[in-house]
Structure formats: structure tokens, C-alpha cells
């Protein structure tokens, strides 16, 4: 107990903050072991001669910031990753969906930057028009033809990443209390944007060939959404691809029930089964789709650049909202990307990335199909970098996450991907951030950890899920 002793000083703020900081410091400096139990609240309060409510506030703050977790009826324990920051670097990172740095075209992009500086001079660091640098928008129109999308520069808005695009649309088109339909499970970044803006969110289940059209129709007959948010190709987190029939059905429903569609696309460039897939936007003849394209999986996520392709009737409001957020996406980044796409084999880079992702996906899928069927249920991913799995119903992915982190394996828990329900037994793994020759060994490590977790009856639903 002696390590918890504090010399409370009035000038250091409220006592609960001082206690919180003291315990946090002990954790970060490995003075408390991973999964170690903290003293009970009454014992801590008596030892420090403070009110029990002070200890409660300190523990609650530690839990909120994920330094501790609570076992119902047992007490408070240190999160494994909280005291193991150095070990995280060595962890098996199934939680990361971004590409590894060795896949970035750094040398060629560096040359593109040099050309941009030489050709543009000081204008490289000035603002460009609100929609974005026009030659880049023209190049993007040419690029979209490879995705079977015909467009024009006036329909392109350069954005600082896909999440900003969603944010712009919500601020442009939606009012407080409007209804948005989303896939469930769905992309956490989009869920966060909808939560922040106070819109009403209705979840529609995702099946093996895309969103559940039957349930979607039932919901549409009772509720009028302004927008449906969807990832039709290699959906995050399931890896599911919508069938062509389902894409056309959604567009017909959009016309019938008069709603817009946000299509969030980050992997339509790739065909994982030698089948050329098209974005939903490629089938849109009624100007219902606002198409968001992120380069996070196909270029370098740190560039924070993407684009929206939009119907003309929403262009002005979207451009105004974009301007109010950051005036324009970095001119330096826009022009550097333009010169990279123009002079440095952009299409060749896409072909290389496609082969890498396709090979990794096939290795992972083969291993999963052969080795996990007796312990987990996986969604039928068509491609991409993610796999979505379910534990038996009486086990929580929060519990599994905590258990695996103590073994050096990191996953993402299912509740992150839901708005309206708590999918406690589901979780996502990604093979994006690992080498091809690591995948089978890493999956084997994951499998052994899950088998060990499931073999202990005490692991059945007992941890309190942190807020």
C-alpha cells in the first residue's frame, strides 16, 4: 500500500485529481503490474484519510481513460496495455488497418514534391480555389474512369480525408434530428460524426452480399431517412461486397423514397477474386450518390487527402461548408499529389498494392477457413484487409481484447462498430499492418490465445465494458 501514499497539497488541485495523477504515474512507470488489482475503494480511502467519493472519482477517471477496468463484484484492475507501452511496439497488431510504412512510395513522392516546389514556387504554399487544385481534379476525373465513373472537375471537392468528407456532408445536408440509416456493423469514424451532430441513426444489418434489403424496405416504409451511409465494396469491418443486384436495388429505393446516399470507398481499385467490381456511384443515373474516396489504403494515410464526387445541386453548400472548416486542403499536399500522379507511375503503384493486398487476403482467408471454424464464426469477406468474427454468445470481445493484450496480441472489439446495439461477442482483425510471411504465425498466435481464453469458464461475461 505504501506506493499509493500521497502528500496532498492544496495548490495541486482537487484531491481526486491528485490521486488520479499519482496512480496514472505509477502505471505508466510500471510501478504497478499489468492486470494487478487496485486496493478497494474503502481501503484506499482509509489509507489516505480521504472521503470515499474522492477515491470513486479518481477510479472513474482512470477507467474512462482506460488505465483500469472493473470486474463486477471483484474490483478494479490495471489494463494490460496501460503499463506495457514498450511492449505494444512488439505486439501482433491485428488492430491496425493502415498499410505498413514500407509500402509507401516515399522516394517517388519526394521527387514529386521537388518538382512541385520547382514549378510552382511560392504559390505552392498559397490557397487554391475552394473545390481544390483544378489540374488535380481533372486527373481525378481521369482516374475515376478506371472505376467506371464518368465525372467532371466541377463535381469534385478535394477533402482532408474521408472522415472530413462525412463531416462536411452532415453539416451541409442534415439538420439536427434528421434520420440517417447506416450499415451495422459500420465504420467507427462515421458513427462518431453522426453522434456528434445529433442526428437520429437507424442501423440496418449487413448480410453476406451487403445490406439487408428486406429490413431496409421495412424501415423505409416507417421512417424517412435523409441519407444512407454505406461502404458497398470490401465493407469495414466485414470485408463484404454488395452484389450488383443489391447496388441497383438501393439506388431504386433512393429514388422511390427520395433519399441521398453517401458511398465511402477505399478499396474499389482492387479485385480480389479476378472479378472487376464497380462502386455504387457507377450505377447512379439519378444524382443520388455522394462518392467519397480515401487514399489511406492505397497511398499514404498521413497525407490526409481524398475527394468527394457530388451531384451539382449540392456542390455550392458542400463547398461553403468545406471553406468554413479549413478554407481548403493543403495546397502543398494537393500539388505534390498531382505531380506524383502525373509523372511517377501512379497506376503502377496501384497494381503493386493490389498484388500485395490480394496475396495477404488469400493467405489469411485460407488459414482462417482451415483453422478457426470450430471456435469462431467469421463473416464471409470477399476481399480487403479486414475479417469480422464472433465468439460464442456468452463471451465478450472486451474480455477477449484484455486477455489477448496480456499475450501481446491486439484486436478491435465489436461494440466500436455499432451504434444501436452492443455486439459484445464480435471483433475485428486486420492483416494490413503485417508482412505476408508473418500472417500465418500471427493468426496461429491469435488462435491459441482464443482457445486458451475460451477454455476458462471464468472468462464468460464478467468484465464491465468501459465507456
Per-segment meaning from a language model:
Residues 1-116, 120, 125, 136, ...:
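N-terminal basic, amphipathic alpha-helical segments
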Residues 229-231, 262-263, 269, 293, ...:
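Short beta-strand segments
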Amino acid at each position: 500500500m505504501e506506493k499509493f501514499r500521497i502528500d496532498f497539497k492544496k495548490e495541486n488541485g482537487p484531491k481526486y485529481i491528485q490521486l488520479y495523477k499519482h496512480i496514472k504515474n505509477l502505471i505508466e512507470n510500471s510501478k504497478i503490474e499489468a492486470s494487478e488489482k487496485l486496493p478497494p475503494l474503502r481501503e484506499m480511502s482509509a489509507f489516505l484519510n480521504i472521503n470515499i467519493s474522492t477515491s470513486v472519482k479518481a477510479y472513474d477517471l482512470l477507467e474512462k481513460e482506460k488505465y483500469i477496468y472493473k470486474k463486477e463484484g471483484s474490483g478494479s484492475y490495471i489494463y494490460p496495455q496501460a503499463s506495457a507501452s514498450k511492449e505494444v511496439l512488439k505486439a501482433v497488431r491485428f488492430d491496425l488497418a493502415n498499410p505498413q510504412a514500407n509500402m509507401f512510395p516515399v522516394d517517388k513522392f519526394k521527387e514529386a514534391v521537388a518538382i512541385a516546389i520547382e514549378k510552382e514556387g511560392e504559390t505552392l504554399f498559397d490557397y487554391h480555389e475552394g473545390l481544390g487544385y483544378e489540374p488535380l481534379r481533372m486527373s481525378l476525373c481521369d482516374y475515376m474512369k478506371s472505376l467506371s465513373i464518368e465525372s467532371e472537375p466541377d463535381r469534385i471537392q478535394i477533402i482532408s480525408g474521408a472522415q472530413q468528407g462525412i463531416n462536411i456532408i452532415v453539416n451541409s445536408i442534415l439538420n439536427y434530428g434528421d434520420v440517417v440509416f447506416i450499415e451495422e456493423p459500420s465504420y467507427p469514424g462515421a458513427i462518431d460524426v453522426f453522434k456528434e451532430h445529433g442526428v437520429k441513426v437507424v442501423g440496418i444489418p449487413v448480410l453476406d452480399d451487403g445490406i439487408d434489403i428486406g429490413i431496409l424496405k421495412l424501415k423505409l416504409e416507417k421512417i424517412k431517412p435523409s441519407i444512407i451511409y454505406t461502404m458497398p465494396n470490401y465493407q469495414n469491418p466485414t470485408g463484404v461486397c454488395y452484389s450488383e443486384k443489391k447496388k441497383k436495388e438501393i439506388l431504386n429505393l433512393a429514388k422511390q423514397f427520395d433519399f441521398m446516399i453517401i458511398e465511402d470507398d477505399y478499396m474499389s481499385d482492387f479485385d480480389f477474386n479476378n472479378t472487376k467490381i464497380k462502386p455504387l456511384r457507377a450505377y447512379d443515373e439519378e444524382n443520388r450518390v455522394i462518392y467519397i474516396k480515401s487514399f489511406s489504403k492505397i497511398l499514404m494515410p498521413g497525407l490526409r487527402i481524398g475527394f468527394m464526387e457530388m451531384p451539382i445541386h449540392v456542390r455550392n453548400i458542400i463547398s461553403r461548408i468545406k471553406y468554413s472548416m479549413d478554407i481548403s486542403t493543403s495546397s502543398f499536399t494537393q500539388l505534390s499529389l498531382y505531380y506524383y500522379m502525373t509523372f511517377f507511375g501512379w497506376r503502377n503503384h496501384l497494381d503493386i498494392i493490389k498484388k500485395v493486398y490480394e496475396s495477404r487476403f488469400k493467405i489469411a482467408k485460407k488459414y482462417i477457413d482451415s483453422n478457426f471454424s470450430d471456435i469462431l464464426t467469421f463473416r464471409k469477406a470477399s476481399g480487403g484487409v479486414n475479417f469480422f468474427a464472433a465468439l460464442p454468445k456468452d463471451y465478450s470481445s472486451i474480455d477477449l481484447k484484455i486477455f489477448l493484450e496480456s499475450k501481446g496480441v491486439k484486436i478491435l472489439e465489436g461494440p466500436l462498430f455499432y451504434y444501436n446495439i452492443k455486439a459484445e461477442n464480435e471483433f475485428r482483425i486486420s492483416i494490413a499492418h503485417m508482412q505476408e510471411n508473418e500472417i500465418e504465425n500471427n493468426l496461429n498466435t491469435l488462435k491459441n490465445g482464443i482457445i486458451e481464453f475460451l477454455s476458462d469458464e471464468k472468462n464468460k461475461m464478467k468484465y464491465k465494458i468501459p465507456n
